[in-house]
Amino acid sequence: MISEVDMDDNFLGLRARDEFYSGKHIHRASQLILLDPENRILLQKRSPGKFWFPNRYTYSVSGTVADESYEACIAREMLEEIGISVPFRRLFKIPCIRENKGAYHTIFSGRCSEEAASLIRHDLEEATSIEWVELEELHRAVKAEPGNYTPALREGIIKIFKEGCEKYLF
């Protein structure tokens, strides 16, 4: 079950995941920007079997919010999707909503040590691959080839660079 919200992100109730595929409901999602000691971001390439944005690159960890807070969701998804847990902080919320469908994406950031990075194992049902990418390189890529990235990742990276990386990531 996934949390349904209104246009102002007020909780309405829980719905089955497949009901959101109709495009008639708004849900919540949590996203993690995971940085390594070299300030590279871990990206995952979404599995071709994913309903939303298959085969596109997205955040290090991405999950829909069930009957839980945004924070509880990202903590749970981190362990499920990459097999590690790191301290994180909330950065901002992005409304990716068009015609009363879509999601509120709350973006978090965390940093892992070299040792923790070596322990990362991605969930093959969620992602076909993961890779570490320089932030500047990602910023250029989301502008040059937007179709390769999820809308929430594009909007988040553009916001971070527009407002200053230091404000959010360091």
UniProtKB/Swiss-Prot annotation:
A GO BP annotation: geranyl diphosphate metabolic process
Keyword Flavoprotein applies: no
PROSITE patterns: NUDIX
Nudix hydrolase domain span: 25-155
Thermal dependence, as annotated: Optimum temperature is 37 degrees Celsius. Stable at 30 degrees Celsius. More than half of its activity is lost after 30 minutes of treatment at 35 degrees Celsius. Activity is lost by 30 minutes of treatment above 40 degrees Celsius.
Motif (Nudix box): 59-83
A Pfam family matched in the record: NUDIX
GO molecular function per UniProt: hydrolase activity; metal ion binding
pH dependence: Optimum pH is 8.5.
Function: Hydrolyzes homoallylic isopentenyl diphosphate (IPP), its allylic isomer dimethylallyl diphosphate (DMAPP) and short-chain prenyl diphosphates geranyl diphosphate (GPP) and farnesyl diphosphate (FPP) to their corresponding monophosphate forms with high activity. The preferred substrate is IPP. ADP, NADPH, Ap5A and thiamine diphosphate (TPP) are weakly hydrolyzed. No hydrolysis with ATP, dNTPs, 8-OH-dGTP, NAD+, FAD or acetyl-CoA.
Name under which the protein is recorded: Prenyl-diphosphate phosphatase
